[in-house]
């Protein structure tokens, strides 16, 4: 039996078995479901938001909650590694172009250089970068002000009635405006001790700003590279 080989043209099946290039590129390309997949990640030790955008469409907005069940940050990083490995493995055959975008470390917060913050987030970033590297996914970082300006349209704080930090509200508001409000809602347990919340049909909720941020980061990474200030991380 012969087949078309993208490297050596027509080859018989026996030749394929001897070939070191086990993956027939042309056949694999035909099997790919999407032209481009972007994974946006808003990383923190409280919650890490993760969004998948495929061919310009938001496919999934989710998050990893680190607030309970972990003794220290090392356990959180290891758990994140496991989750990312499963995610990255699940999409590897769905596109030839998969990139990961994380939020760039802010060296200064309100004018101060927070060394402990930089070290802890740097360690978290290394987990994400190494996980992406394992699957040969290019990984980029997005400046907070850049993605907010390009996707949300503003980074100016806005007051709101939902007890959301004014700095976070523009992003929440934007995600709601594009039809993904339900994806960034956090339903609170009945016995919750949280004092600030809002209600929908008698149920208590908060907005998940980490999930919202990850969505905007993914949408920013989906733009043509020359329209962004993305920086490749290695």
Indicate where each model-derived feature is located.
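Cysteine-cluster motifs in flexible loop/terminal segments that predominantly coordinate metals
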Residues: 2-28
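N-terminal low-hydrophobic presequence detector
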Residues: 1-2, 40
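Phosphate- and other anionic-substrate recognition elements at nucleic-acid/protein interfaces
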Residues: 28-234
């Amino acid at each position: 039996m012969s087949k078309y080989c993208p490297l050596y043209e027509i080859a018989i099946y026996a030749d394929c078995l001897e070939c070191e290039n086990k993956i027939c590129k042309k056949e694999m390309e035909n099997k790919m479901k999407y032209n481009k997949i972007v994974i946006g990640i808003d990383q923190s030790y409280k919650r890490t938001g993760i969004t998948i955008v495929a061919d310009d469409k938001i496919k999934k907005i989710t998050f990893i909650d680190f607030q309970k069940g972990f003794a220290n940050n090392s356990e959180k990083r290891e758990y994140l590694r496991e989750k990312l490995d499963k995610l990255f493995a699940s999409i590897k055959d769905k596109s030839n172009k998969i990139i990961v975008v994380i939020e760039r470390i802010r060296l200064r917060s309100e004018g101060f250089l927070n060394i402990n913050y930089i070290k802890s987030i740097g360690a978290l970033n290394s987990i994400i970068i190494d996980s992406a590297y394992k699957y040969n996914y290019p990984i980029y970082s997005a400046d907070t002000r850049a993605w907010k300006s390009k996707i949300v349209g503003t980074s100016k704080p806005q007051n709101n009635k939902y007890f959301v930090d004014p700095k976070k509200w523009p992003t929440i508001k934007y995600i709601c405006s594009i039809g993904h409000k339900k994806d960034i809602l956090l339903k609170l347990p009945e016995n919750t001790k949280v004092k600030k919340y809002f209600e929908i049909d008698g149920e208590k909720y908060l907005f998940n700003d980490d999930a919202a941020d990850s969505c905007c980061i993914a949408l920013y990474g989906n733009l043509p590279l020359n329209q962004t200030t993305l920086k490749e991380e290695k």
